[in-house]
Amino acid sequence: QRISIFRPDIEKIKSFSHPKISLSNFKWEKRKIKIGYLEGNHFKIVVRDIDKKDAISISNKIRKSNFFPNYFGSQRFGRLGNNPKVGKMLLKKQFEKALIEIANDSPPRVKERIEDYLSKNPKDFLGALKRLPRKNLLIIVNSVQSKIFNEILERALDEGLDFTKKGQENCILVGYKTNFYDGNLGIIEQDILKENDLTLQDFNLQEIPFLRMKGGYRKALVEAKDLSVEVAEDEEFSGSKKIILEFTLPSGVYATTFLNNFFDFPTPEQ
């Protein structure tokens, strides 16, 4: 990971020591690293305890892989997969219900903040929500967009839509300014939104302005670049193989989504 340190203490950096972290490739820059600057991520991943036959077939499948569906990974939906449910409550202005769910899944200090505010302002659930970290609330509402994106993409692929065609490489990230696509894709988009019991205007949450979502687009299919795959003896599991993968993905694309095409990993609920 590339990081930036504002006005660094050079001596402290020189003496930095941690058993699992090393610092290298130092250089001065005029600006700090911010959201939006990232071009992509390079991954090196080891998957262990694989049967020899499976290791060969899986590695061959990975080498032949091309584009894959750009689904949001399960981590987007929270530790228990609960974020879209809470996000929908916020969009539907069910502020008390949303606050209860957030409090139940929050550390003690956040619960105390909520309880302290409500003790002084009974029934002001909206006010209590506004005192929570913006980033946390944004993640919750963004998860609704992500869930809808995944459902649209999955149904579109099931119905044989071709996302390699020019002008049809994206799926919507729904918001109050969304323009649905023409044809079958647009029908799917509107059907999925209706099935989630949501409208475009639900995303125009005036009560919490920083949660208003205009909408956007996201690539439907992406490619893993700089891909290398190696099968080797697994030194930790006698008699088994390990697969060592290296690949680069664009910003915002999940390594777990790529890997799920080849490996049966447990979900957070499991």
Regions flagged by a language model, labelled:
Residues 1-246, 250, 260-270:
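Extended, charged/glycine-rich binding lobes that contact polyanionic ligands
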Residues 257:
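Classical protein tyrosine phosphatase
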